[in-house]
Each structure stands twice: as C-alpha cells, then as structure tokens.
Amino acid sequence: MPEYRSKTSTHGRNMAGARALWRATGMRDGDFHKPIIAIANSFTQFVPGHVHLKDLGQLVAREIERVGGVAKEFDTIAVDDGIAMGHDGMLYSLPSREIIADSVEYMVNAHCADALVCISNCDKITPGMLMAALRLNIPTVFVSGGPMEAGKTKLAEHKLDLIDAMVIAADDSASDEKVAEFERSACPTCGSCSGMFTANSMNCLTEALGLSLPGNGTVVATHADREQLFLRAGRVAVELCHRWYGGEDPTALPRGIATFEAFENAMTLDIAMGGSTNTILHLLAAAQEGEVAFGMHDIDRLSKRVPQLCKVAPNTPKYHIEDVHRAGGIMAILGELARGGLLHTNAATVHARTLAEAIAQWDVTQTDDETVHTFYKAGPAGIPTQIAFSQATRWDSLDTDRSEGCIRDIAHAFSQEGGLAVLYGNIARDGCVVKTAGVDESIHVFEGTARVFESQDAAVKGILADEVVAGDVVVIRYEGPKGGPGMQEMLYPTSYLKSKGLGKQCALLTDGRFSGGTSGLSIGHASPEAAAGGAIGLVRDGDRILIDIPKRSINLLISDEELALRRAEQDAKGWKPVEVRPRKVTTALKAYALLATSADKGAVRDKALLDG
C-alpha cells in the first residue's frame, strides 16, 4: 500500500526538528499518524469571486479534523480579469495561471501533504489549481466560492451582469444616470460573475471531470446550501485518502478520475452549455499536466456531434447561472447528454463510483428524492452582500421544462450543433476557436475586409473613432501568449463593436483570447500566433477573409504564392508588431513569454525547451 507522503517529515528520529515545527503549528502526538491535507485557498479582497473565502478554508479544516485528518491551509494569488481588463494589467492574467499551479505544487510538495482541497472560483484560479492537481496526482477535491447573483434594475427588463455595464458605458446615447445605475446594479453580491463566463464555465467543468461535488458550479455564493458543499469537500478529502493510502484505489487520484474519457465528458458539457472559449485553453493545459492525449482535433470532433442544450448570458439575456441551478444544474445537462449516448458514464468521480450513478442520484428528472429537488431550488435573494451563506431563499418550483426551459433535451436543443467550434485554414493552421452559441445564425458564413491592428489598444481606439465599419473583419495580432505577452482578453473591442451597433455586422479575429462574457463573431486563439510565425501576422489591410462556421474553416483569400511571398518578407523583417507599443513588459512577463506555447497547446510552458 502507498505510505502517507507526510511520513517523510513526521516519522523517524532524524525528523525531530521537522516534528518540532509541526508541533508549533498546533499538531499533537496523535496527529502524526493522520493524513495531512493541504487546503489551497485563494481569498483576496481584490476579487468579488474570492472576497468571501477568508473563513471558508477553516470551515473545511474543522470538518477534515472532525473526521480524522490534519488540515493545513495556505493561500495563492487571484487576479480579477474584469478589473485588470483594458490596460496592461491584463498581461498578467493568463501568466498568473502558471504561478497559481506552481505555488500549489511548491506548498504541497515542500511540506509532503497527502491530499488537497482546492478552494477556487474565478477565471485563472480554477484552471491553475486543476493543473496543479493533475501534476501532483494526490487525492484532491475541488470546491468553488460559487456564482454571483445576477443584477437587477428598473431600467432594464432583463437581469444584468458585468457585460451590460461595459456595453452601456460605451453607448453614446445612454445618459450618465443610466450608466451609473447599471454600474451599481450589475454585480450585487460576492461570487464569480453571474453568466456562463470563464469562471463559472470552469467550475461547472470540474463537475463533469468528476473532481467536484454536484452543485459546485451553480449554487450561488450567497446561499446557505453552499456551506454543505464545503463541509462535504472536507469529508471527501479524508475518504479519498483512505481509498488511496488504505486501498490503493486509482480512482481516488486526479489522474484516475480525469482520464481521456473524463476530458471528453467535460468538453461535451462545455459545448452543450456554450461555455467560454477560455475553457478550451484551460482544458488543453490541464490535459497536458495529466499526460492525457486530448487536443484540438478531439474538440473539433466533439463540436460536430454535440448539440447545444443550454443558453445562458452572455449568449442570451434571459438566463444566468442561478437559472441553470433551478433547472437542475450541471447534473441535469449531463443527464440529457447521457440519454443521448454522448457521455462516458463509466467515468469515476470523487463522490460516486461512476458518473452514471451520480446522474441517477442527482438529475432532477430522474430522481424523486425530495432532498435533491430542494437543493436545486436554492435561489438568489436579491440582497447586495459580500457574505457567504447569508440567505436561504428557494424557488417555489424547479424548471424541468426540457422543451422550452433553460436546459433542453436533445430533441428540443437550442442548436443541433454545439456552442463551441474549432476552425482551421490558411490563417490558422493549428486552429482557432469561436463560441458559436453567441454568434447570430445570419453571420455563420461571413466574408469581410481585414482591418488590421497591432494591439488591443489600437483596435479600441479605431473602433471608438469609427474607423471600423460594417463588413470589416477586425484583426488584432501580436496579442498571443508570446506576443502580448500574456494573451490578453479582447472584451473591450467586442463590447465596443456591440455599442456601435456592429455586433452582427463585423467579425473579430485575434491570436489573443476573449472574456467568457464575449459574444458575437469573435474568433480567438489563432494558432500559431503571430509572434510564433503564424499566418495571422501576414494579413494586410484590405485583404478579404472568409469565415465559414458550418464548414469549420477560416481563410485569407489570397493565393498560396502570395502567402509564401509575404512569409519570406516577414521572416526577413522578424515577427514583431510594425508599430511600437507603449507597453511595459517586465522581467516576469518576459520569463512567461520565453517558454509559452501557442493557444492550441493550452499556452503552457514548452517542455521541449525546459528538457533541452
């Protein structure tokens, strides 16, 4: 049987000094034979999705100790993409994912922890911790801080979120008073932003991967029911320890749970719910850490056969994550996919022997268990607060309408092709991605004129100055992992196109990425990126670009000979922006850029460079 990793520092005469230090943290004689479980928290007052996490690590710790473990909490960093958006702060967002993964590895391995509870929530924190969990491969369970309640105001008929505040601010026809009202109403509580943006998408995907508990992605942060998820996570961590160290059960480990089949399940869910395009980047990165051969071609294959069963903001103003929960949450979507034969239901989870068992227990349309039905009735209270578990409001009924409700069955899908797609062509040899869930069907095939910008900042200025017109394809390049560096999100350009009335009349192509709040014909992750010799660096103003989502293609409409000639010219000049960009690239960012791969590899470090 495997021995506790912690015995390295808790057993033997030569570890007297280490035990002395452990005792100084509060450990006693009887604790040295128990599993030491690390709690990776991510509390910070900078991020609304994490502002309420301060005491939640200790909530988990007390439960771990109650059921026979030793708990040791630490914190990692968390960047708020919305606050970092639109300035050089966004250069740090994606690189922070690697720092988070490293910091969890450093703490867990330095102190020989036996298991791990990951308390995450927002955009790069869940992916960073997921990468660490698969890298470490010790018993791990995820529990997130939960989604924010959607905002409300008398000035709008629909619920609000961050994107509404950004779009209204760029609308010249909106009064200052209306902008202020949207600003004050859009983000009313603690939690990750209320739509199917990156944070909520990733927290939902941990359910499909089998690494978190039912409801992890959908119970609002303010609801008392989420407290039970934290307590149960503590108990599950100890159970996983017993299963691995006491029984050598491989399904107690992240790599025994998050297998190739589990990654297919997660991506299938992602496509079905129209998740953020960033999830593709993060799943590819996590797969590499877990040594799972899951890549862009697998995503492309799945995107052609998985229907879209759920449509949530920013893809529609009608529904937010709180509405997904009322409809049965992620387990309900997985249930519909399973009935369509689209899942590997024999995959393991941290809370059930198989995904099939989990669905049977938690899908509200399959079970009569009143406890489960009550759980999914947990709803928003509409009271602004930064306090977790502060309300216990419940809907009067569940949304089980699978023909016209928030979650659909396959026969009544929003679209028979899913919400995400991979496009290939001479402008993106290794692929690029688009959230089809947010693209109006009238522009699924779009031919337009290239309007090229060498940075996001230049594109924003051009859009606001009305230099972009209907029929243009806005090309923003040298914003990839290396070229940015840091692969900025392009939320401001897409929001400003909307506010200018061009959301359905223009396309945007970039080697950068998009916020989970983006909608419209926004195509990101063009690979290879311009800084790595990608053909997006060869596009010129006035070129024609053809985008064909049904055919999964994107092409620069010039001859192969012209493309080769341009490449030779660019090779001679060097692959860098034509214009000097007023951008401070620090040593930390240069270190990230030096090792970063393009988006089709998850923008992770190039291990070939490290291994020499």
Swiss-Prot record:
Report which reactions are catalysed by this protein: (2R)-2,3-dihydroxy-3-methylbutanoate = 3-methyl-2-oxobutanoate + H2O; (2R,3R)-2,3-dihydroxy-3-methylpentanoate = (S)-3-methyl-2-oxopentanoate + H2O
Q: Which UniProt keywords apply?
A: 2Fe-2S, Amino-acid biosynthesis, Branched-chain amino acid biosynthesis, Iron, Iron-sulfur, Lyase, Magnesium, Metal-binding
List ligand-binding residues for Mg(2+): 81, 123-124, 489
GO-annotated molecular function? 2 iron, 2 sulfur cluster binding; dihydroxy-acid dehydratase activity; magnesium ion binding
Q: Which residues catalyse the reaction?
A: 515 (proton acceptor)
Going by the record, the broad EC class of this enzyme is lyase
Question: N6-carboxylysine (modified residue): where?
Answer: 124
The SS bond pairs are none
Cofactor requirements of the protein: [2Fe-2S] cluster; Mg(2+)
Iron-sulfur keyword on record? yes
Q: GO cellular component terms?
A: cytosol
For this chain's record, the cofactor binding note is: Binds 1 [2Fe-2S] cluster per subunit. This cluster acts as a Lewis acid cofactor.
Stored Pfam families? ILV_EDD_C, ILVD_EDD_N
Q: InterPro entries in the record, alphabetically? A: Dihydro-acid_dehy_C, DihydroxyA_deHydtase, DiOHA_6PGluconate_deHydtase_CS, ILV_EDD_C, ILV_EDD_N, IlvD/EDD_N
The enzyme's E.C. designation: 4.2.1.9
- Pathway recorded for this protein: Amino-acid biosynthesis; L-isoleucine biosynthesis; L-isoleucine from 2-oxobutanoate: step 3/4; Amino-acid biosynthesis; L-valine biosynthesis; L-valine from pyruvate: step 3/4
The residues the record assigns to binding [2Fe-2S] cluster are 122, 193
GO biological process terms held by the UniProt record:
isoleucine biosynthetic process; L-valine biosynthetic process
Q: Could you describe the subunit structure of this protein?
A: Homodimer.
Function per UniProt: Functions in the biosynthesis of branched-chain amino acids. Catalyzes the dehydration of (2R,3R)-2,3-dihydroxy-3-methylpentanoate (2,3-dihydroxy-3-methylvalerate) into 2-oxo-3-methylpentanoate (2-oxo-3-methylvalerate) and of (2R)-2,3-dihydroxy-3-methylbutanoate (2,3-dihydroxyisovalerate) into 2-oxo-3-methylbutanoate (2-oxoisovalerate), the penultimate precursor to L-isoleucine and L-valine, respectively.
Family, as annotated: Belongs to the IlvD/Edd family.
> Which NCBIfam families did the record assign?
ilvD (TIGR00110), PRK12448.1 (NF009103)
Q: What is this protein called?
A: Dihydroxy-acid dehydratase
